[in-house]
């Protein structure tokens, strides 16, 4: 067997590219594979939010659910610090701007939720303060007069999802990693020194070549394909795939410096460096499924007109001047969450040398996920308690 590596990273999104880059910097022999192209799927389709406050999906189910979701806050804080220096370390622009993020409220119930959320986040070390209407007049005059308060985190912001992962992939190659696109991992067998993995590569002419690669370790950084890849290694990695709606407007003079989210609605919006406004926040799209109801991730998922309209209404309600800005395009992005909304990060039970990271905010938390995984690959003890994110926590007999 001619090909051998210290680690094979599966998934060419931001997380996979970061892991390949960091591991290669550590001196590991790294192969990064993606069944399609680098940045083709979730990392390149998302809206590029860097949201370190708890999102609406994490608090809409109530205070207890929010407390559980807040257990990921050490990863949020770590990622916020890493994003602040990532462009300098990579040596390229990733479109990062951490100019602050607002979660806005329109009524007393939502303000009460903001106060609870801010207290919870501060207990974990995230600096969040609540702004009243008069303060918002100065900080965010573009907001609707219906907005009566907001939580502000100075760490939040945005990155450019179109360029971030490709830039990191180039840095990984410069550090010595090999990158193979159009290459699907289809099988694995355990060996005394790690794994022999079967790779199926399709070249640009459609010709298929299958080869086996020996590796000491495998990292699953494959988003919605996590559960499928776990099965290749005989492991149960339960995830819930989601198809979500995004919309981009035409260019408009810069007027929104913040990431904006809502305490009572599915909304995130921010103005990109090219002056378009990106609108998202969790409005569903139609995830394509087969006749048995199983998701088919290789098919093109479908937009739902009422989601596009609902998302646009939420955006205009928060920022009224957007009503005069034409929408240019809407598209579907995918993500995956765990049943308890916390990420899966760490070693895969029953599959020695296999590691995984995934869960809801993998773009935002990608730098932290990758740093943790790279440390585990190198045998370093993690400086973040990974117990709440244990991939085995849903396995029968495991203690959450």
Regions found by a protein language model. Give the residues of each.
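Helix-loop-beta segment of a Rossmann-like dinucleotide-binding subdomain
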Residues: 92-103, 117, 124, 128-175, ...
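Active-site lid/adjacent beta-loop-alpha segment flanking the redox-cofactor pocket in flavoenzymes
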Residues: 253-351
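Glycine-rich FAD pyrophosphate-binding loop
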Residues: 25-46
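Central helical "cap/lid" subdomain
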Residues: 39-40, 209-211, 215-257
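N-terminal Rossmann-like FAD-binding beta1-loop-alpha1 element of flavoenzymes
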Residues: 7-32
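Dinucleotide-binding Rossmann-like beta1-alpha1 core, especially the glycine-rich loop
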Residues: 49-135, 266, 306
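Helical element adjacent to the flavin cofactor pocket in flavoenzyme catalytic cores
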Residues: 151-216
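C-terminal catalytic lobe of FAD-dependent flavoproteins
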Residues: 313-400
């Amino acid at each position: 067997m001619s090909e051998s590596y210290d680690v094979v990273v599966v998934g060419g999104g931001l997380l996979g590219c970061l892991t390949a880059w960091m591991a290669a910097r550590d001196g590991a022999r790294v192969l990064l594979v993606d069944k399609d192209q680098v940045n083709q799927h979730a990392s390149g389709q998302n809206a590029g939010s860097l949201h370190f406050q708890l999102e609406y999906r994490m608090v809409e189910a109530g205070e207890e659910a929010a407390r559980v979701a807040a257990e990921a806050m050490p990863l949020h804080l770590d990622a916020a610090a890493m994003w602040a220096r990532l462009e300098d370390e990579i040596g390229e622009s990733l479109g990062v701007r951490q100019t602050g993020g607002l979660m806005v409220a329109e009524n007393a119930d939502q303000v009460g939720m903001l106060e609870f959320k801010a207290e919870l986040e501060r207990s974990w070390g995230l600096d969040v303060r609540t702004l009243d209407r008069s303060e918002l007049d100065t900080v965010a005059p573009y907001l609707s007069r219906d907005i009566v308060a907001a939580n502000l985190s100075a760490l939040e912001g945005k990155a450019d999802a179109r360029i971030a992962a490709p830039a990191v992939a180039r840095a990984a190659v410069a550090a010595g990693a090999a990158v193979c696109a159009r290459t699907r991992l289809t099988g694995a067998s355990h060996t005394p020194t790690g794994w022999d993995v079967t790779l199926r590569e399709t070249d640009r002419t459609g010709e298929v070549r299958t080869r086996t690669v020996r590796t000491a370790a495998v990292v699953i950084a494959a988003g919605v394909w996590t559960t499928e890849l776990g099965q290749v290694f005989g492991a149960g990695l339960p995830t819930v795939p989601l198809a979500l709606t995004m919309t981009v407007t035409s260019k408009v003079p810069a007027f929104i410096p913040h990431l904006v989210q809502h305490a009572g609605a599915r909304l995130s919006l921010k103005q990109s460096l090219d002056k378009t406004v990106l609108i998202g926040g969790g409005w569903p799209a139609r995830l394509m499924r087969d006749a048995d109801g199983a998701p088919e991730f290789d098919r093109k998922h479908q937009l739902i007109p009422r989601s596009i309209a609902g998302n646009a209404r939420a955006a205009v309600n928060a920022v009224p001047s957007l009503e005069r800005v034409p929408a240019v395009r809407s598209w579907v992005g995918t993500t995956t969450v765990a049943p308890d909304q916390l990420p899966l990060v760490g070693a895969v039970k029953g599959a020695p040398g296999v590691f995984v990271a995934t869960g809801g905010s993998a773009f935002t938390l990608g730098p932290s996920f990758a740093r943790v995984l790279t440390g585990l690959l190198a045998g370093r003890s993690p400086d973040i308690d990974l117990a709440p994110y244990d991939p085995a926590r849903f396995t029968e007999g495991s203690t959450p």
